[in-house]
From Swiss-Prot:
Its EC number is 2.7.7.4. It comes from the Archaea. It catalyses: sulfate + ATP + H(+) = adenosine 5'-phosphosulfate + diphosphate. Keywords: ATP-binding, Nucleotide-binding, Nucleotidyltransferase, Transferase. Pfam families: ATP-sulfurylase (PF01747), PUA_2 (PF14306). One of its GO terms (biological process) is hydrogen sulfide biosynthetic process. This is Sulfate adenylyltransferase. Belongs to the sulfate adenylyltransferase family. It comes from Archaeoglobus fulgidus (strain ATCC 49558 / DSM 4304 / JCM 9628 / NBRC 100126 / VC-16). InterPro entries: ATP-Sase_PUA-like_dom (IPR025980), PUA-like_sf (IPR015947), Rossmann-like_a/b/a_fold (IPR014729), SO4_adenylyltransferase_pro (IPR020792), Sulfurylase_cat_dom (IPR024951), Sulphate_adenylyltransferase (IPR002650). PANTHER family: PTHR43509, SULFATE ADENYLYLTRANSFERASE (PTHR43509:SF1). Transmembrane segments: none annotated. Pathway: Sulfur metabolism; hydrogen sulfide biosynthesis; sulfite from sulfate: step 1/3.
Length: 456
């Protein structure tokens, strides 16, 4: 059997749409109409999405081969078949939406270049190829599925309690479709700057610095407890003639649900795992992707496969309730997708076995618990003491944290817990709340250099 090698980017080539030279950027934006990017907020003002994160992930190649906001035919293809017009599979609508009032005020049309401003500075351009209208509720419903149309995995109708459904439902009705280009490269703030590895850089580090041939991706939106640590260690035993050489932790950074951990604590918590030797730093690397999470379980897992293949991973671990919230999907929906496909979502076979599909190899995992009889963290498929199991409960752990109780070492490493405390002191609360979301939306993860917009 041939040895596994780094897969090509999804679509065959990494998208890189970032202008590095100031003089070229200034020529591109001279005389362009401008539009200040705005967050999507709930009626109470709580931010749930900022399109700048999608623009960053498109232009740096995380979403390759997507290059911008989708034209209408491509939107329909994605909703109906989870494929782009180029045939490559892709799970989610990527759209630049504006209100009818803003569209009228802008007075732009197909063929125009729109300069997108962020924090008062030039950020990116959108070369408008098409302008069309959507029904946001229809897009939201078709994005995630229904029990009637997707009976294999959808268990409950989606509603306003589902964060991803609300994000699409609250899209504005006017879509400006076209390619994005970043013209004023942002600088990441601490601590994000040391975890920023866009696909081209990540692939370079994996090949030349880490010298990993096989790499398994770990998706996270949580500070790691010991169960997460064991998942990473055990899933990494996959590979070919030897275990995977590297574990790439890729955190999703963006708007979170209230009660989640702050992004900074998530990144530095995972960093503590290798910094203090629980997994050797030679085998463990922490990174992130900008994305306001949609919590789409099997649909979200497709995006994770796209992102991590683009970053250079050969394998991806998937647990139960992957990227899920509530009970909208079967808890094993992602594993069903990657083991047999979901025909109603356009997959007669797993995503890595269809034409124009992914090359990343799935590693479906069961769960880990503490067994007092084995006196160790046990894998559910190995341990026979089911009646004695003590599950890792995220809500129970959050309750301990909220009470200021130091979790036992068997639940969370003390060095990881200290990162929660560190950011608790910064924000005066250990978890995401409205105040944190509003501050994060105002400050964002980046700063932009000052840049003048030349006249035409």
């Amino acid at each position: 059997m041939p040895l596994i090698k780094t897969p090509p980017p999804h679509g065959g080539k990494l998208v890189e749409r970032v202008v590095k030279k100031r003089d070229i950027a200034e020529k591109m934006i001279a005389g362009c109409p401008t539009y200040e990017l705005k967050p999507t907020t709930l009626p109470d003002g709580t931010p749930i999405r900022h399109v700048y994160r999608e623009i960053m992930s498109v232009c740096y190649g995380f979403f390759s081969p997507v290059e911008g906001s989708m034209v209408q035919n491509e939107l329909e293809r994605v909703l109906n078949e989870r494929r782009l017009l180029s045939e490559w599979i892709f799970p989610y609508p990527i759209l630049f939406d504006i209100s009818e009032e803003d569209y009228k005020a802008l007075d732009v049309k197909e063929g125009d270049r729109l300069l997108l401003m962020l924090k008062g500075q030039p950020f990116a351009t959108l070369d408008i190829e098409e302008v069309y209208k959507i029904d946001p509720v229809d897009v939201a419903t078709r994005t995630f599925g229904t029990p009637e149309k997707n009976p294999e995995v959808v268990r409950e109708p989606f509603d306003d309690k589902h964060p991803g459904y609300v994000i699409y439902k609250m899209h504005n009705p006017i879509i400006l479709a076209g390619k994005y280009t970043i013209v004023n490269e942002p600088k990441f703030k601490e601590p994000y700057d040391r975890f920023w590895f866009p696909p081209s850089k990540c692939r370079e580090v994996i090949k030349n610095e880490k010298k990993w041939r096989t790499v398994i991706a770990h998706q996270t939106r949580n500070v790691p407890h010991v169960g997460h640590e064991m998942l990473m260690k055990c899933a990494a035993y996959t590979g070919d003639i030897e275990p995977c050489h590297g574990i790439l932790v890729n955190a999703i950074i963006g708007a979170k649900r209230r009660g989640d951990y702050p992004d900074e604590a998530i990144l530095e918590g995972h960093e503590a795992v290798n910094k203090y030797g629980y997994i050797k730093p030679e085998r463990h690397m922490v990174t992130f992707t900008l994305w306001d999470m949609r919590y789409g379980n099997p649909i979200e897992s497709l995006l994770h496969g796209v992102i991590r293949q683009n970053m250079g991973c050969t394998h991806h671990m998937f647990g139960r309730d992957h990227a899920a919230v509530g009970e909208y999907y079967d808890m094993y929906a992602t594993q069903i997708l990657w083991s047999q496909g979901i025909p109603s979502f356009g997959f007669e076979a797993p995503p890595n076995e269809v034409d124009y599909g992914l090359k990343i190899i799935p590693q479906n995992m069961a769960e880990f618990w503490y067994c007092p009889i084995c006196q160790e963290i046990a894998y559910s498929e190995n341990c026979g003491h089911t009646d004695a199991k003590q599950k890792f409960s995220g809500s129970f752990l959050r309750g301990m944290v909220a009470e200021g109780v130091f979790p036992p070492r068997v639940v969370m490493r003390p060095e990881v817990y200290k990162q929660i405390v560190k950011w608790w002191k910064v924000y005066n609360y250990p978890f995401v709340n409205r105040k944190y979301l509003e501050l994060k939306n105002k400050e964002l993860e980046i700063d932009l250099p000052a840049m003048e917009v030349p006249k035409a």
